Design a protein with these regions (language model features):
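Terminal domain-initiation and capping elements
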Residues: 2-113
């Protein structure tokens, strides 16, 4: 049988030992802008692309149509310049909706130079 030691007799360090490093991200890093580029594929319809650009990226219909056409003819097109988290969120929303409809729509998010 093991001996029970009362807790009040156990020596504990006076201060807890905590080892951590505080990492700060400069504000300019948080505010960096990224370009969202839409890529062409042979499956996703013009209608879906145009609607997604209007609803998710809040682009005017005529501009959305121009982006869809440029994507089709050149293989890719510039959509918007946004902070990284916003760009990722919008791309995720469009790609999720695309997958739900069976479309392989893809985007690229790249740092603005």
């Amino acid at each position: 049988m093991s001996e029970v030691v009362p807790l009040d007799t156990v020596d504990a360090p006076a201060k807890p030992i905590i080892d951590f490093e505080l990492v700060t991200i400069p504000e300019e890093e948080l505010e960096k802008l990224y370009r969202v580029i839409i890529l062409n594929d042979d499956v996703t319809t013009f209608e879906f692309v145009i609607l997604a650009l209007i609803v998710v990226f809040e682009i005017e219909e005529s501009r959305a149509e121009a982006i869809a056409w440029e994507t089709h003819t050149r293989g890719e097109a510039y959509v918007a310049t946004l902070p990284l988290e916003e760009a990722k969120e919008k791309v995720f929303r469009v790609q999720y909706a695309a997958r739900e409809q069976g479309y392989p729509l893809e985007f690229v998010i790249e740092p603005e130079e």
